[in-house]
Amino acid sequence: MSGRLVHNSVSDDVTLTVTSTAGSYAATNMQNKQPSMKWRSTTDAAQTISGDFGAAEVIGCVVLYNHNISAAGTVAITLASNSGFSTDVYTKTVDALDATAGYGTQKYGHDGYGGYSELGWQQRFTIIWFTPVSRRYFKVVITDTTNSDEYVEVGRMMWGDFTNIPYRYGAELGWREQTEVTRTRGGALRSDARNPYRYTNVESTILTDAQVADALEIFRAAGRRSDVLWSGFPENTDEYLERRYTMLGKLMDYSSSIREAEGSSI
């Protein structure tokens, strides 16, 4: 198995140009590492977000996280070497969300819903993977003209390259509970109802020297300070499997490189 790790969002330091902005929901909120801070448009008309990296950057992934784009919406990205988007153009258009699966579509017990997947439980994020290209100018066009909110909003946007991390079977995925339960003087149980958070724990297989160097650089540059995107099954034909093993979060613990007989693992 091989996952992908994205950590260096080169769009965080550029000036973003957007079609519209509602009140204090500024475009700079998409560059904040707290996805609860959002950019919001004034209407549900097609919205364009564009910028200039300042120099050619290698891009292989675009992330829109914590958005309200509906299943009817689309996201189109464009990269180019000139501001007019006419030279060395790369484009890709995807559906904003995976299709909703009805009864009988998934295997029995899928996600605890007895074979039923409905829009309400889906996390609102869109990940666009592609073969990395080097370009200077970028834009994304969000088209969702029937959005029930009558506006479009995005909490986090990332443009960057990805590092392939092959990993062993036995990878963990679960929820960490932060709620503390105490007993009152009268004997009743009381909880402080804190929100749980999702986590994954991965051990790599044997890595190439280049992969080790990339992973260690991510640990140094991002550490616990920045956000990273992890996808355990990128571009998998089972889109529901890919969504379950994709998360935007922080590296809470990571090990050093261990040199083995065949190579290195982390």
Summary of predicted features, one role per range:
Residues 1-48, 52-57, 61-74, 80-266:
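Extracellular/virion structural assembly segments
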